[in-house]
Amino acid sequence: MGKLLIVDDDLSILRVLKMRLESEGYQVEVASEIEAAKYLAAINEYELAILDLKLPDGNGIDLMKSIHEVDPGLPVIILTAYGTIESAVEAMKAGAYIYLKKPFDYRELLFQVKNGIEMANLRWPSRN
């Protein structure tokens, strides 16, 4: 399976997602701050990123834009508890693969992780 980056300021969400996705065979790295996430994205190759929309030091959309400067083909799932139609549209226009509201169904998230990686591999075969 692939390597994932998860960024969320809620440490319980980070722990649960890391544990569940690792049990599915993924390698998972986590960050709770934007600068740490940017650093990880600069030194690692990920197959997908899961980013919280609202972070204490910024937002997931701006983080996604920064990550896409390093890896334009990286699929990004945006998660949020504070979602609006406007923020969903903004995220998708900025390059998000999908936008999910918290609380989310883990099965849906897992499906979107698998699907996002497959779609990215089809669009950018050099990512394989």
What do the PLM-derived regions correspond to, one by one?
Residues 44-50, 55, 77:
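Active-site beta3 strand of CheY-like receiver
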Residues 39, 61-73, 90:
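Short amphipathic alpha-helix used as the core "switch/output" element in two-component signaling
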Residues 8, 52, 80:
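Active-site residues of response regulator receiver
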